[in-house]
Amino acid sequence: PLLERFHKLSAPVSRPEGSISGSIRISAPNAIGNGLLIPWITAFQRRNPELFVNLTLTLGPMHIIPPECDIRINHGLYPCSNAVIRKLGEMRRMMVASAGYLAKHGVPKTPEDLEFHELLGGNDLVNGAPLVLLKDNERVIVPIHSKLRLKDHTAARTAALFDAGISVHAFRSDTMELVRRKLLIHVLPDWEPEPSPVSLLLPIGRKPSSAVEALCDFIAEKWRSNPELVFDHGL
């Protein structure tokens, strides 16, 4: 029996039927990586235990895919000269602040009230770009004059947790849980900041491996099933 147990323990682990092996190098903005991608990748690896993934998180978009990258996820409408672009959809945004900040500075009742508040944005609002808010067929533009300028949406939301202001580009996909836990308060819930378009980028001239194609399909399916994300049905 002891020898039989030894043979069982030393036998090679069989790969689950239909699973994928190999390695994938993927790059994504910090907010998408932490809020969405890491849980999805770990779920994908549980299905495919012999798959290795190298994930690099960055601040802001990329205009050129690095040669060592198999998949890049970009948000925003930025051109990328060496990529095949597959649209995923859009990330819905919301505005949030802490109870402490709102108690001290007041709760905005209209978009115009935001001009008297400290507004915390991401990389797409640091160079003088205004905040665009949508409600049905209405569109309002709010200028931003922030004392604290942050190039990352997650950092802006963290600053809001510490009473620094109103995070105006927080992604709904991972912020609603903080609202449900009463750590943040949804500001002007009838108004929604312009959504952020998101795409999968694949290098031109390189045939994607079966592992890359499978992970892209998995990400697209996860995107489709998340009610806080808008899926592009043309994918």
Segment roles from a protein language model:
Residues I141-H186, E192-P193, P208, C216:
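Hydrophobic hinge/microswitch elements
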Residues R47, T56-L150:
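Acidic, Gly/Pro-rich loop/turn segments at junctions of secondary structure
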Residues P12, S27, N54-T58, V187, ...:
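Solvent-exposed beta-strand sheet faces enriched in polar/charged residues
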Residues P1-R15:
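Alpha-helical "hinge/linker" immediately C-terminal to small N-terminal DNA-binding modules
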Residues S21-S81, D232-L235:
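Central regulatory/effector-binding core of bacterial HTH transcription factors
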Residues R25-S27, R72, L120, G165-S167, ...:
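Short, well-ordered beta-strand segments
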Residues E50, R172-R181, W191-L235:
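C-terminal effector-binding regulatory domain of bacterial HTH transcription factors
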Residues R86, E112, R157-T158, E213:
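Alpha-helical segments flanking ligand/cofactor-binding loops in enzyme cores
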